[in-house]
Amino acid sequence: MVSKSKMNFIISLQKKKVREEERLYLIEGDKLVKEFLAAKMPVRILAARPEFLNSLPLVHKQGVREVIPASYDDLKKISSLKTPHNALAVIEMPDIKMDTDNLRKELSVVLDCVQDPGNLGTIIRAAAWFGIRNIYCSENCVDVYNPKVIQSSMGAVIHVNVFYTDLRKLLESAFSAKIRIYGALVNGDSIYSHKLDNTGIILLGNESKGISEELLPYITDKIMIPKISRATSGIDSLNVSMAASVIFSEFTRSKGRQL
């Protein structure tokens, strides 16, 4: 049974301020929890149905600081979801230092004011799929540890580093170092004909406003995904997470041609 004080603590982690103060975040779902346990992520609390706990290998439970058998009603009270899963865990945030030297060595992603949790989670998932290790977010992007981001990333936060920083300073430094900065813009060149490198920065903007005016001068390569459909209404753009997946895929395809 989950005590009332423990319930209140777990529920409080749905708030960004508390997550930042405690350096903890929530994950939910049988598959997600098992994946984090298998990856030996630092689990502070595991609250789960007894049958779920019994299904876990002993080695997966040994690294958990506190294991709490929970009823369905317990999980329903502490879950951020309408329908709770069999397991929920509180995870310690990693302490990863931002190393901008990586911008010279590999392909990185920069996100300007992406505010929808589902979009950020999907972008992280796509980045992990295509081998992109680092994402740099503006400080007004949605929090990577928002429960909805974690859910939509499907555990990909394990494999991708997400940093929050001043994008103008970051891009100014990259521009001065002659690092190519690919900005996704409506007036860009088709990504299918534009020459793409194995390294550089992919810059993606806000869902409705696009890339901020102050960042436009640092773009070295304007790219876009051409519309193939002849439909004249109803489809005027791709959302940022869909666009990100297409762009990541094309960079990977281009890289394959260069190997």
Go through the PLM ranges and name each one.
Residues 29, 115-123, 235-243:
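Amphipathic alpha-helical repeat scaffolds
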